[in-house]
From Swiss-Prot:
Name of this protein: 3-isopropylmalate dehydratase large subunit
Gene3D superfamilies: Aconitase, domain 3
Cofactor annotation: [4Fe-4S] cluster
Organism: Pectobacterium atrosepticum (strain SCRI 1043 / ATCC BAA-672)
Catalytic activity, reaction form: (2R,3S)-3-isopropylmalate = (2S)-2-isopropylmalate
Family: Belongs to the aconitase/IPM isomerase family. LeuC type 1 subfamily.
Keywords: 4Fe-4S, Amino-acid biosynthesis, Branched-chain amino acid biosynthesis, Iron, Iron-sulfur, Leucine biosynthesis, Lyase, Metal-binding
PANTHER family from the UniProt entry: 3-ISOPROPYLMALATE DEHYDRATASE, HOMOACONITASE, MITOCHONDRIAL-RELATED
GN (gene name): leuC
UniProt: [4Fe-4S] cluster binding residues: C347, C407, C410
Function: Catalyzes the isomerization between 2-isopropylmalate and 3-isopropylmalate, via the formation of 2-isopropylmaleate.
Length: 466
C-alpha cells in the first residue's frame, strides 16, 4: 500500500522505534521566541547541557514586542524580562537571534519561510501552536510545549506518536476575490473546530494548487483551528520558485539535488487516508466568524444562525453562549453589524500579498468615523517591501495606523488589544473569548474583508467594493 505525504515525512525522521514505545524523531529546524523558551533554557543551564545543534535553532522576538517603538520596555515589565532573557540565552548558548533591532525581526512563522529556514521534507517545531504554518512547504511542522522545547534544544529529537491522516480536497476554481483565508474558514466551518483532532491534514485539489505560497501558509496556519496536529501541502514548482535564492535555501548543485528530492514528497496515488473531506471552491463566499471559535463562521451575506437550528446539544449550547458573549442576535446579517477596531496582521495574514490585498480596498477611501484600524507587517522585510511599493502611504492616507512588525493584536500580550465590549474585524486565527483583550469580540476575516470593514464601519461584502 502507498504512503501519504505525512507518513513519508514521519518515517524519514525516525531515529529509534521499539515495540510498545513512542517513536523518536529527528528535528531539522527549531524555531524559538521569547514566551515559551525561558524555562527551557533554564533547564539546560541547571543540568549543565548545551544546545545540541545551535545551527539548526533560530530565535526571534514577536509575541511581546511593541509595534509602535523599538523600546524593549514599551510592553511592560514581564515582556521586558522575557525579551532580555532571550537575548541572554541566545548569546550564552550560541543561538542566532533576530532581536528588536535586527532588520529581519518579525513573527516567527513569517521569518522562517521568508529566510528559507523552512524547506520541504523537514521536521520543524516551535513552542507555538501555529507552527503548522510551515507545512505549506511540505514539511512536518507542529507546535510543542516548553518541556519539549528543552528536549529539542538538548537532543535535536522528540518523541512523537503517529497521527491519523486526513485529506481535504478543494476542487474547482475559487471566484474572484476569494482568498486562502476564506477557503480555510469555509473548511473549518464544515469540519468544526475539533473535526481534525488526532489527524495531520493534507490540503489538495485544484483550488489549493492555484494558491501562492503565502496563501498556502494561511491555509496551513489554521489547520490547528480544526483540531489538527499539522497541515501539509505537497511541494511543487510554486514552492521551489518561492524558495530559490533565499538565505538558507540550498545553492547551486545542492539546489538541483534538493529539488529532485523535494519533487518526490507527495502522497502516493494508492495512499489510504483515514478521513476525506471535499469542498467546491466555486461555492465559497467571503467568510466572517460570528462566534467564539473559528468553526462558528458563515458567508458575509448569510444570516447569523439560530442556536435552535443545531441538532447537536453541545453545538446548540455553544452557539447560544457565543451569541451572548458576542452580543449578537440570530437572524441578523453580519453586514448590519458595526465594528470598533480592525487588525490586519498576525502569522496568518501579515505577508506582502495580504497587505497588497488590503491596500487595494483602502486606496482612495477613508477609515470610517469612530473606527481604529491598524496594519502590522509580519517582519522587517515585509515592512520594507510594502514601503517600497508605497502601501504604507495608501494605508496612512486612508486613516490606518502603519506599525512595526510583531504579533500585535492577535493576542493580548502586548499593548495592542481590545477594550471590553469592543468589536474587531481581525485577520488573525483565533476568536476565542478574551483572545484580543478581556471581553473583546473578535471576528475573523481575510485582509481585504478587514479593509472593507474599516472603510465602511461594518462588515461588508468585499465583492461589492472592488
Amino acid at each position: 500500500m502507498g504512503k501519504t505525504l505525512y507518513q513519508k515525512l514521519f518515517d524519514a525522521h525516525i531515529v529509534h522505534e521499539a515495540p510498545n514505545e513512542t517513536p523518536l524523531l529527528y528535528i531539522d529546524r527549531h524555531l524559538v521566541h521569547e514566551v515559551t523558551s525561558p524555562q527551557a533554557f533554564d533547564g539546560l543551564r541547571a543540568m549543565g547541557r548545551k544546545v545540541r545543534q545551535p545551527g539548526k535553532t533560530f530565535a526571534t522576538m514577536d509575541h511581546n514586542v511593541s509595534t509602535q517603538t523599538k523600546d524593549i520596555n514599551a510592553s511592560g515589565e514581564m515582556a521586558r524580562i522575557q525579551m532580555q532573557e532571550l537575548i541572554k540565552n541566545c548569546a550564552e548558548f550560541g543561538v542566532q537571534l533576530y532581536d528588536l533591532n535586527h532588520p529581519y525581526q518579525g513573527i516567527v512563522h513569517v521569518i522562517g519561510p521568508e529566510q528559507g529556514m523552512t524547506l520541504p521534507g523537514m521536521t520543524i517545531v516551535c513552542g507555538d501552536s501555529h507552527t503548522a504554518t510551515h507545512g505549506a512547504f511540505g514539511s512536518l511542522a507542529f507546535g510543542i510545549g516548553t518541556s519539549e522545547v528543552e528536549h529539542v534544544l538538548a537532543t535535536q529529537t522528540l518523541k512523537q506518536g503517529r497521527a491519523k491522516t486526513m485529506k481535504i480536497e478543494v476542487t474547482g476554481d475559487a471566484a474572484h476575490g476569494i482568498t486562502a483565508k476564506d477557503i480555510v474558514l469555509a473548511i473549518i466551518g464544515k469540519t468544526g473546530s475539533a473535526g481534525g483532532t488526532g489527524h495531520v491534514v493534507e490540503f489538495c485539489g485544484k483550488a489549493i494548487r492555484a494558491l501562492s505560497m503565502e496563501g498556502r501558509m494561511t491555509l496551513c496556519n489554521m489547520a490547528i483551528e480544526m483540531g489538527a496536529k499539522a497541515g501539509l501541502v505537497a511541494p511543487d514548482e510554486t514552492t521551489f520558485n518561492y524558495l530559490k535564492g533565499r538565505q538558507f535555501a540550498p545553492k547551486d548543485a545542492n539546489w538541483d539535488a534538493a529539488v529532485a528530492y523535494w519533487s518526490t514528497l507527495k502522497s502516493d496515488d494508492d495512499a489510504q487516508f483515514d478521513t476525506i473531506v471535499t469542498l467546491d471552491a466555486a461555492q465559497i463566499a467571503p467568510q466572517v466568524t460570528w462566534g467564539t471559535n473559528p468553526g462558528q463562521v458563515i458567508a458575509v451575506n448569510q444570516e447569523i444562525p439560530n442556536p435552535d437550528s443545531f441538532s447537536d446539544p453541545v453545538e446548540r449550547a455553544s452557539a447560544a453562549k457565543a451569541l451572548a458573549y458576542m452580543d449578537l442576535q440570530p437572524g441578523i446579517k453580519l453586514t448590519d453589524v458595526k465594528i470598533d477596531k480592525v487588525f490586519i496582521g498576525s502569522c496568518t495574514n501579515s505577508r506582502i500579498e495580504d497587505l497588497r490585498a488590503a491596500a487595494e480596498i483602502a486606496k482612495g477611501r477613508k477609515v470610517a468615523a469612530g473606527v481604529q484600524a491598524i496594519v502590522v507587517p509580519g517582519s522587517g522585510p515585509v515592512k520594507t517591501m510594502a514601503e517600497l511599493e508605497g502601501l504604507d502611504k495608501v494605508f496612512i492616507e486612508a486613516g490606518f495606523e502603519w506599525r512595526l512588525p510583531g504579533c500585535s493584536m492577535c493576542l493580548a500580550m502586548n499593548n495592542d488589544r481590545l477594550n471590553p465590549g469592543e468589536r474587531c474585524a481581525s485577520t488573525s486565527n483565533r476568536n476565542f473569548e478574551g483572545r484580543q483583550g478581556r471581553a473583546g469580540r473578535t471576528h475573523l476575516v481575510s485582509p481585504a474583508m478587514a479593509a472593507a470593514a474599516a472603510v465602511t464601519g461594518r462588515f461588508a461584502d468585499v465583492r461589492e467594493l472592488n
